[in-house]
């Protein structure tokens, strides 16, 4: 839409506002040696001519800032509105549902589901949504008296108007709210660890086929999610912002071409080899990675649009 430079001549950075407000980016001068052609800049101002440490710090800055932003948001969420229990302690098990009928009670702690270790509600939710060949789920539970018991639970299947089916277990977290400055600090870090752990499990499950790509949401799907979230209050919008910021950090840290993590991976190879990788080769690899990401994004967006018309 428009761009500008600061009046300070020592700062040649070009700032711009783009047509689609879907995120921010930094385009460093001379990211590749072939791009280092601007004669107005000194050689040491090109990124490709900076030391390995400097390039490494620049590349992890985005991920680091995403994490810091999420921690700040989660802290203020916990400080102002308080936080609920993050550990996988059963806080709600209504009668007439599979979990309570199996014998699991409020206060029990779910430690495993189908062999997956769970210690937070975020991870428990992910595990319950993974593909499972059998109808029965195995819950390993630590009872309030310290005993460890296993329960075989078959969830109810509820069919929505659009034909989609949802598995219902009848289990929930405690609604008790904890407040206070130090509790807010604890909540922000515990929640960060919980979301990161759940994100890694999600990515691993996508590669192994235990989670379908149809479970992912693209720009169109996120627009709908944000719209629905705004209807239920500011606290949920803030949490969603922190959640997305952490997700972006995790994805960007992956050692995949075109991601910052992929570029860091090439710096690590450079450290090991003692010399730079051919810039053309690295450029082609990042180009292929970017093309694959665009294909994935198109597929996910197509699925988002199909869901809108169901």
Regions inferred by a protein language model and the residue ranges of each:
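Juxtamembrane boundary at the C-terminal end of a transmembrane helix
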Residues: 299-310
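Hydrophobic alpha-helical segments of integral membrane proteins
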Residues: 15-25, 29, 56, 60, ...
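Small-residue-rich helix-interface/hinge motifs
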Residues: 1-39, 244, 254-273
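Membrane-interfacial loop-to-helix junctions in multi-pass transporters
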Residues: 231-240
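Alpha-helical transmembrane segments of multi-pass membrane proteins
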Residues: 27, 66, 70, 74, ...
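PDZ peptide-recognition modules
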Residues: 6, 31-53, 58-61, 65-211, ...
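Membrane interface segments of multi-pass transport proteins and intramembrane proteases
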Residues: 3-6, 89-95, 268-284
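Short helix-coil transition sites and intra-membrane helix breaks within transmembrane domains
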Residues: 211-216, 253-259
């Amino acid at each position: 839409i428009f761009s500008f430079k600061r009046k300070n001549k020592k700062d040649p950075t070009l700032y711009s506002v783009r047509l689609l407000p879907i995120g921010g980016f930094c385009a460093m001068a001379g990211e590749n040696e072939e791009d280092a052609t601007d004669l107005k800049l000194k050689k040491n101002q090109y990124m490709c001519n900076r030391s390995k440490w400097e390039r490494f710090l620049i590349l992890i800055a985005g991920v680091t800032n995403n994490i810091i932003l999420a921690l700040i948001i989660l802290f203020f969420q916990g400080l102002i509105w308080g936080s609920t229990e993050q550990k996988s302690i059963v806080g709600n098990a209504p009668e007439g549902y599979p979990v309570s009928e199996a014998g699991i009670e409020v206060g029990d702690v779910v430690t495993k589901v189908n062999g997956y270790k769970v210690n937070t509600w975020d991870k428990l939710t992910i595990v319950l949504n993974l593909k499972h060949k059998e109808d029965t789920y195995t819950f390993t539970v630590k009872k309030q008296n310290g005993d460890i018991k296993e329960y075989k639970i078959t969830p109810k299947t509820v069919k929505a108007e659009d034909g989609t089916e949802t598995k219902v277990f009848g289990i929930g977290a405690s609604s008790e709210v904890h407040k206070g400055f130090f509790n807010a600090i604890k909540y922000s870090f515990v929640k960060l660890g919980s979301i990161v752990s759940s994100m890694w499990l999600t990515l691993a499950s996508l590669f192994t086929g235990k989670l379908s790509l149809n479970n992912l949401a693209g720009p169109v799907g996120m627009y709908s999610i944000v719209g629905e979230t705004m209807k239920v209050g500011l606290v949920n919008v803030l949490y969603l912002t922190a959640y997305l910021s952490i997700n972006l950090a995790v994805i960007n840290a992956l050692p995949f071409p075109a991601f910052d993590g992929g570029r860091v991976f090439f710096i690590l190879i450079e450290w090991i080899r003692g010399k730079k990788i051919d810039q053309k080769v690295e450029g082609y690899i990042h180009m292929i990675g970017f093309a694959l990401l665009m294909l994935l994004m198109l597929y996910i967006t197509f699925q988002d649009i199909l869901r809108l018309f169901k």
